[in-house]
A protein has these predicted regions:
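Conserved donor-nucleotide binding/catalytic region of nucleotide-linked donor-dependent transferases
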Residues: 331, 337, 343-363, 383-384
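Acidic donor-binding loop of glycosyltransferase active sites
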Residues: 285-295
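C-terminal alpha-helical cap of glycosyltransferases
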Residues: 366-387
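Catalytic donor nucleotide-activated moiety binding site of glycosyltransferases and closely related
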Residues: 75-84, 223, 247-273
Length: 387
């Protein structure tokens, strides 16, 4: 058993496995090779797609690290991305959490090296992964799922627990969580901070040119994957109306992923379909102001150097946004057309306020969550290869 230090970390000693880290340390290039089989089980359904997109980006990062990797997903057939999914996929009537028999059968059939549960999972499913000899990653982005991951029964099965948000949003480990890690040092906790696919400068410039935002400063409105979210049925409509109002004030405005088409009268409005992650990041890097919900896009915008206005559209987002405001890294606006447009216009007109927000974001030193995830997978695959 490794004692915890005063900062809640387990010291790295004697080659022992560290069970608390949010720092990325590159491993040897040849740490593990071959074609790892990775099974992703993100919570999915007709409303929202944050977990699916996060798991997709981790799968892409794994493919870059291991070109012959074999990612496989199980998704609800109602998920917004299910119809045109870029990886091998098993479609289920609802989220994988509700289909333990099918998920257990899939695990037994695929014999994955690692199973990644993203905000999903049942005890039966974790046991099936263990029975197949797989290593288990559990990603939590909400307090309830984090508590589940720290239950004694699950702690014995989970090899890596990845907390999807940075510490200033998700909170540091509690004394009880540190105590449980001390008793079970074989399990690792990592903060992913921000999932940020990084286009090259050349790719960013090409994307900006293609999308028509290469030169003119603009405000970017990104509603996110909230089309049918039960907590914000009208969110997309309100984002569209707010973007149009901002454009009508004379500000160059870009609206992404709502299906809306700009009318001829909307001279200052550019409407774009849902974009690949690297093109979205290219726009976030170039936008003066980003208006988005309190999910993953907010963190991506902050890490990209944009001044952000956060709008809550789901039940877990108001507290997250309050923490961002307290940290001085974002402004908050209600889900209301006039307030969103007015705040965007005000921030566009204040270079000093934008600079203060960006400077506060830079002080956070948000880590690259994809690099951290790949490091975790390398660790698990090395252990599996040695077992």
């Amino acid at each position: 058993m490794h004692p915890l230090g005063p900062d809640g970390k387990v010291p790295r000693d004697g080659g022992a496995r560290c069970n608390y880290t949010d720092e990325f340390t590159p491993g040897p290039a040849a740490l593990i090779n071959g074609a790892p089989r990775l099974l992703f089980l993100p919570v999915s359904g007709p409303a929202g797609m944050g977990e699916t997109v996060r798991s997709m980006q981790i799968a892409y990062a794994a493919r870059r690290r291991w070109p012959d990797a074999k990612p496989h997903f199980a998704l609800s057939r109602e998920a917004p991305l299910a119809a045109d999914f870029p990886f091998d996929c098993t479609l289920l009537p609802a989220s994988p959490t509700f289909h333990s028999a099918e998920v257990s059968q899939l695990i037994a059939s695929l014999q994955p090296d690692v199973v990644i549960f993203d905000n999903s999972g049942r005890t039966r499913q974790l046991r099936a992964a263990r029975a197949a000899g797989a290593r288990i990653v559990y990603i939590s982005s909400r307090p309830r799922q984090r508590r589940k991951a720290f239950r004694w029964r699950w702690r014995r099965m989970i090899d890596e627990h990845w907390i999807a948000y940075p510490r200033f949003l998700a909170g540091s480990l509690s004394w009880l969580e540190r105590f449980k890690l001390r008793l079970q040092p074989q399990s690792t906790v990592r903060y992913l901070d921000v999932i940020l696919p990084a286009p090259t400068p050349q790719a960013e410039a090409r994307a900006a040119q293609r999308l028509g935002v290469a030169t003119t400063p603009f405000a970017l409105f990104v509603a996110g994957g909230v089309t049918n979210h039960p907590h914000a049925i009208d969110a997309v409509r309100i984002f569209v109306a707010a973007a149009k109002r901002c454009a009508a004030m004379g500000h160059r405005t870009v609206l992404i992923g709502t299906g809306e088409q700009a009318a001829a009268a909307d001279a200052q409005l550019i409407t774009l379909p849902r974009l690949p992650a690297d093109e979205l990041i290219a726009l976030l890097r170039r936008a003066q102001v980003v208006v988005t919900n309190g999910g993953a896009t907010l963190l991506q915008a902050m890490a990209s150097g944009a001044a952000c206005i956060a709008v809550p559209i789901a039940g877990d987002q108001p507290e997250r946004i309050r923490r961002c405001v307290r940290a001085g890294v974002a402004l908050a606006a209600p889900l209301a057309e006039s307030a969103m447009a007015a705040q965007a216009a005000e921030l566009l007109g204040s270079a000093a306020q934008r600079a203060a927000l960006v400077e506060s974001c830079q002080r956070l030193k948000l880590a690259d969550g994809l690099a951290i995830a790949v490091q975790g997978l390398e660790c698990l695959l090395r252990e599996r290869g040695d077992s």
